[in-house]
């Protein structure tokens, strides 16, 4: 039996990962391929002094990466997803993973290991790299057009293998997927390069939200002070956490949706009056809002939900409605009973998150921060009434 081990962050899994798996299996006529998301980022520089960048470079929780891999591979034959490396308490090293699967399936089989040519260049930095070469055959996917052996003219390499410390490395040259998870997150172009069902999962759970918030809250913002730009993102993060904490009390099944609504609720808060009205006028027929809206300052809730749905493929109406209603919760509903638990939680979290201040944002704020965990309806009504009085 021929078994291929495919290790990596898979954060997020994209079409190139799936194409690599298929091509590797075809190359060696493999019987089984196992995806193994890792529990640690090796060789990645992390700036812990920049909180936003640090949060962006953290690995997405393993259960989400496993779920996305299972979605992306659900129709593929002889391809499995394993959480072996995720379960390791310490850093999971390739040599340990190889030994584990040889114990499971037996050492008499042929084992292969997929890597990119960028990793091959620093392979001697890997733990027990010489043992790895003895235990498995390497399938190397070439990145770029430069010959790994440094012997072919650039852009014309056709090497199928080469000798690496007396071990044959199988080379894949005709791989034409120029995709990376980081580039997808930077552009937040999630409508191409990944399985549509994976996109739905990402949106449903609010994954990679900081990249999208940064794109809109910073790129479109005219503040010169980076602190003020980042403050908006941090407000969204605090609201998201409070939404999660509240939903943990009121409906644990909706915790992910609570996070998603909280993290994205102010995605277009950066738009000024001219930009908000221009967006409104351009999409008026889709927004279903009359021209008599109370103030341009409340438009960001409707515009944000519209942006998420039309540009980024969000489908969950529970999340989208909560975002729409977080400034004017009673617009477009007939009575209080139509408001969802998520609507009320997002509204309260936005007004009561830890950085909101007494008198300026909400009177008796500590009282309401406690009350909202005990009686959501009472807290919502009283906070809403106070906010309405403040606007008069």
From Swiss-Prot:
UniProt cross-references to NCBIfam families, sorted A to Z: bis(5'-nucleosyl)-tetraphosphatase (symmetrical) YqeK, cyt_tran_rel, nicotinate (nicotinamide) nucleotide adenylyltransferase, PRK07152.1
Catalytic activity: nicotinate beta-D-ribonucleotide + ATP + H(+) = deamido-NAD(+) + diphosphate; P(1),P(4)-bis(5'-adenosyl) tetraphosphate + H2O = 2 ADP + 2 H(+)
Protein's name in the database: Probable nicotinate-nucleotide adenylyltransferase/Ap4A hydrolase
Annotated ranges, domain HD: 232-355
Gene from which the chain derives: nadD
Chain ranges passing through the membrane: none
Enzyme Commission identifier(s): 2.7.7.18, 3.6.1.41
Biological process according to GO: NAD biosynthetic process
Binding site for Fe cation: 235, 265-266, 350
GO terms, molecular function: ATP binding; bis(5'-nucleosyl)-tetraphosphatase (symmetrical) activity; metal ion binding; nicotinate-nucleotide adenylyltransferase activity
Family: In the N-terminal section; belongs to the NadD family. In the C-terminal section; belongs to the Ap4A hydrolase YqeK family.
Region (Ap4A hydrolase): 230-392
Residue segments, region NaMN adenylyltransferase: 1-210
Function, as annotated: Catalyzes the reversible adenylation of nicotinate mononucleotide (NaMN) to nicotinic acid adenine dinucleotide (NaAD).
Coiled-coil region: none
Keyword terms of this UniProt record: ATP-binding, Hydrolase, Iron, Metal-binding, Multifunctional enzyme, NAD, Nucleotide-binding, Nucleotidyltransferase, Pyridine nucleotide biosynthesis, Transferase
Pfam families: CTP_transf_like, HD
């Amino acid at each position: 039996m021929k078994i291929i081990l495919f290790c990596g962050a898979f954060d997020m899994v994209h079409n190139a990962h799936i194409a690599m798996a298929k091509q590797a299996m075809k190359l060696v006529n493999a019987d089984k391929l196992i995806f193994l998301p890792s529990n640690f980022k090796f060789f990645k520089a992390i700036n812990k002094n920049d909180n936003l960048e640090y949060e962006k470079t953290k690995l997405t929780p393993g259960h989400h990466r496993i779920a996305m891999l299972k979605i992306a591979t659900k129709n593929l034959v002889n391809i499995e997803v394993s959480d072996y490396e995720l379960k390791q308490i310490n850093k999971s090293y390739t040599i340990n993973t190889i030994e584990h699967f040889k114990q499971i399936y037996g050492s008499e089989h042929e084992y292969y290991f997929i890597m990119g040519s960028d990793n091959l260049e620093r392979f001697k930095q890997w733990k027990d790299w010489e043992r790895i070469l003895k235990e498995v055959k390497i399938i190397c996917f070439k990145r770029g057009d430069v010959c790994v052996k440094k012997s072919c003219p650039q852009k014309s390499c056709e090497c199928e293998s080469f000798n690496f410390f007396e071990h044959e490395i199988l080379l894949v040259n005709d791989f034409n997927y120029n995709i990376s998870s980081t580039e997808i997150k930077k552009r937040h172009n999630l409508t191409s390069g990944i399985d549509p069902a994976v996109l739905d999962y990402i949106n449903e759970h609010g994954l990679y939200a900081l990249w999208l918030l940064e794109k809109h809250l910073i790129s479109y913002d005219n503040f010169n002070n980076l602190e003020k730009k980042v403050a908006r993102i941090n407000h969204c993060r605090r609201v998201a956490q409070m939404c999660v904490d509240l939903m943990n009390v009121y409906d644990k099944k909706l915790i992910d949706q609570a996070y998603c609504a909280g993290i994205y609720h102010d995605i277009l808060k950066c738009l000024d009056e001219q930009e908000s009205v221009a967006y409104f006028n351009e999409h008026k027929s889709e927004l279903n809002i009359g021209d008599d809206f109370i103030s341009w300052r409340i438009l960001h809730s409707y515009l944000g939900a519209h942006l998420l749905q039309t540009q980024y493929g969000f489908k969950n109406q529970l999340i989208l409605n909560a975002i729409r209603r977080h400034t004017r919760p009673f617009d477009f509903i007939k009575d209080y009973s139509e408001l969802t638990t998520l609507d009320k939680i997002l509204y309260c979290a936005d007004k009561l998150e830890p950085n909101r201040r007494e008198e300026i944002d909400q009177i008796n704020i500590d009282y309401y921060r406690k009350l909202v965990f005990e009686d959501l309806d009472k807290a919502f009504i009283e906070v809403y009434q106070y906010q309405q009085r403040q606007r008069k």
